[in-house]
A protein has these predicted regions:
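Short, surface-exposed secondary-structure boundary micro-motifs
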Residues: 4, 118, 124-125, 130
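Short beta-strand segments in beta-sandwich/barrel cores
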Residues: 80-82, 99-104, 118-119
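A short glycine-rich, His/Asp/Glu-containing loop-to-beta-strand
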Residues: 44-85, 90, 169-172
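Short acidic-glycine-tyrosine-enriched beta hairpin
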Residues: 107-124
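Double-stranded beta-helix
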Residues: 2-41, 46, 130-172
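Short, conserved beta-strand element in jelly-roll/cupin
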Residues: 72-76, 86-103, 141-144
Length: 172
């Protein structure tokens, strides 16, 4: 039923398409926003900030005019630590679909996300991700879509993170 209302800028090769006016019961969509559908049988991968990660674009950036981005990140077994960094954005939300990833905010604040776990990181929060030797698949949402990444020096000087302590976050 929706095929007559599909936005003309359909990405035929990617399975991503937007619906201009779904004409549902009330049709009070926020101006400038569109319904977007990303078909799993035709994923659209784009370049991203890490060479060892495949970024599946879900079409949200275009549908929200850059106000939000949603991507599925696939990091295989040949991945590495990100180094200390921060993101220039309002927030970054992670939902672990498969595998696991370990993220540290300090030597005492180390979190391991496994399938079904989620985390919201406010923009500007310094952190480091360990490599995920078993691989990981994550849904990442950022507001806004344009999320700058800046490398920063180790805020703890010569202190190295012991990622084996993941999950033992010390509350202060």
């Amino acid at each position: 039923l929706l095929t007559n209302r599909v936005h003309p800028t359909r990405h035929a090769d990617s399975g991503i398409f937007t619906i201009e006016k779904p004409n549902v019961a009330t049709d009070n969509a926020t101006p400038g926003k569109r319904v977007v559908v990303s078909k799993g049988n035709a994923p659209h991968f784009i370049p991203g900030r890490r060479s060892w990660v495949r970024y599946r674009e879900l079409g949200v950036t275009e549908a929200t005019n850059g106000e939000m981005r949603a991507q599925v990140l696939h990091a295989g077994t040949a991945n590495e630590s990100t180094g200390w960094h921060l993101h220039r954005c309002d927030m970054q939300f992670l939902y672990c679909i498969d595998g696991a990833i370990t993220i540290a905010f300090s030597p005492d604040h180390i979190v391991r996300l496994e399938a079904g776990d989620s985390m919201m990181i406010p923009g500007g929060t310094i952190h480091i991700e360990a490599g995920a030797p078993e691989g990981v698949e994550i849904l990442e949402i950022s507001i806004p879509a344009d999320m700058g990444t800046e490398s920063v020096p180790n805020p703890y000087g010569d202190v190295q993170i012991d990622f084996s302590k993941a999950g033992t976050v010390t509350a202060r």
